[in-house]
């Protein structure tokens, strides 16, 4: 396993730069460059060459995914559980009507920061922090929010700012 990531350090940096990041992303939304998807993909790859998620796992410790029916079906099947039994054991409905974990950290996160259901993990987990998404300028609010939790998202915005 890699050197542990100082989550609080990145959180404080993200708080300090939140206003600047909002401005950069707002400008990007107003006039996105034609090659934005390509730039974002390159930056995403650079960041994840630097950051080892298993040295952090803050998303797994503090953010619960929104479970879609396909996620529930896939994971219940993996555990050879009936859907109602899986939902009763692991999930609850939040104030927005979304199905989320009953408690955090994620019950499938191991002490080694590895996901015990990695190959069948929820779509939200597979895609987090959404920095390789096409048309990233359409999810600025989510990108800013993710910088507060995810060091990779913070570095992504910093590198994006420097490239534009």
PLM regions and their residue ranges:
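Short loop/turn segments that flank or connect secondary-structure elements
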Residues: 1-164
């Amino acid at each position: 396993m890699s050197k542990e990531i100082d989550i609080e350090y990145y959180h404080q940096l993200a708080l300090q730069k939140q206003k600047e990041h909002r401005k950069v992303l707002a400008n990007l939304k107003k006039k996105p460059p034609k090659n934005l998807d390509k730039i974002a993909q390159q930056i995403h790859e650079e960041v994840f060459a630097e950051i080892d998620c298993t040295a952090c796992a803050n998303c797994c410790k503090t953010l619960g995914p929104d479970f879609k029916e396909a996620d529930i079906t896939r994971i219940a099947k993996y555990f050879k559980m009936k859907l109602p039994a899986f939902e009763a054991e692991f999930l609850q409905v939040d104030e927005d009507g979304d199905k989320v974990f009953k408690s955090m950290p994620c019950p499938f996160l191991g002490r080694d920061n590895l996901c015990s259901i990695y190959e069948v993990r929820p779509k939200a987990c597979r895609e987090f922090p959404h920095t390789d998404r096409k048309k990233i300028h359409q999810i600025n609010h989510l990108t800013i929010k993710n910088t507060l939790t995810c060091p990779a998202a913070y570095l992504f915005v910093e590198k994006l700012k420097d490239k534009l």
